[in-house]
Amino acid sequence: VTGRQADPGSALDELRGEGWQRLLAAARRRLERTGGMLEGAVGLTGPSEAERRVVIGVTGQYRPESVKRLTVDLAALDAALREMHDRSLPTVLAWLHGPLRDRPGERQAEAEQRDQLRATLNAGRHAGESWYATWTEAITGDGTLTRLLRRGDARLVPWAVAVLDRLPVPDDRPPLPLPVLA
C-alpha cells in the first residue's frame, strides 16, 4: 500500500477496492460535515481483512485480526494518500465520487438567505398588523421559507409581500378592485 504510482487513473483505481471503500466513504462524510477540515478521525466497525490491511498500510501500525474497530486519523490518511498517489484526501474523494460538499457553508448560506426573506417580510406595508404577523409567523415557523429556498422559489416571498402591500391599510385608501389584486 506504499510507493508512488505514475499513471493517476489506473493508480487510483485501487482506491475503489474493498479495503478502501468504507474508509473513504467515512472520510468523505466527515470532511463534508466539517467543511473540509482534515481534523479528527474516522472509524470502521467490524473491519474486513482487506480493510484491516489498508489501515495497517495507512497508519504503519499492526492491527490484530481480532480487532473490532479500526480508527484512522484524517491527517494520517491524507499524508498516506499524498505519499502513495501524490494526491490529497479531498482530491482523491473528488476524483472517486465528485466534489465534496461544504455542508456548514451550505447551512450558513441558507440561514443568511432565510434572514433576508424574513427582512423582506418584516418590511411589508402591513408588518404592524396582527393578521400579517400571524401569516409571517406561520410561514416562518412551519418551514415554508426553507422549502421555498431549497427548491429555488425564494422569489415568491417578495412577490407575495408586494401583492399584500397592495391591500389597503385601514383608513388609508379606498379598497382596490379585486382584478387589480389578481
PLM features: residue spans?
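Nucleic-acid enzyme cleavage-core boundary/entry regions
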Residues: 1-182
